[in-house]
Amino acid sequence: MRWNRRRWLGALLLVGPVGSGAYWWSGSRSAAADAPIKLVVSLSARELRVIEHGSTVVTYDVAVGRPSHPTPTGTFTTGDIEWNPSWTPPPTNWAANKKYQPPGAAANPMQAVKIYFQAPYYFIHGTNNPDSIGEAASHGCIRMVPEQASALARRIERAGGHATLVISP
């Protein structure tokens, strides 16, 4: 096989430098229409349903944004799935005194996986605070039991790497 500079450059641009924490997201609503998996989040019920071929295959209890930091509503396409992510406090007032958490750290609020869904800082991810599940406790992200977040991410990857995400009040 011959080395193809253009392909390698494209791969590097898509993935980013190793360890950069960069992610790629198409943001394409047309991609959402083609996604074989649909995730439906009810903020009031605090649950995430996974729908495949028109049928609910699994329902997870989740934590959602608190009233002061609500989870955005609408239709989204999930983007990059990052395994074993680090956590860098976002440049927001609530995170001003928080510290960087490396991958695998017990205090890392992302835990084993994060699934991007809305710019700039909204994810579906595991949690280091499982008691928050079923509550309005996050700063807008959708928190899951870590093992369930990993199972969801694997399901999305098997289905092509993206899903339609519908979040309703």
Where are the regions that the model predicts?
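Exported/periplasmic cell-wall-interacting domains
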Residues: G21, S28-P36, T73, T92-P169
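Hydrophobic alpha-helical membrane-insertion segments, chiefly the h-region
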Residues: V15-W25
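Solvent-exposed coil/turn segments that connect beta secondary-structure elements
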Residues: S44-R46, H53-T56, G65-P67, I81-N84, ...
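N-terminal export leaders
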Residues: R5-G10
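A structural motif detector for short, solvent-exposed N-terminal "entry" segments of globular domains
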Residues: S30-T73
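Structured segments of extracytoplasmic/periplasmic soluble domains
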Residues: I51, I81-N84, L152-A159
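Secretory targeting signals
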Residues: M1-W3
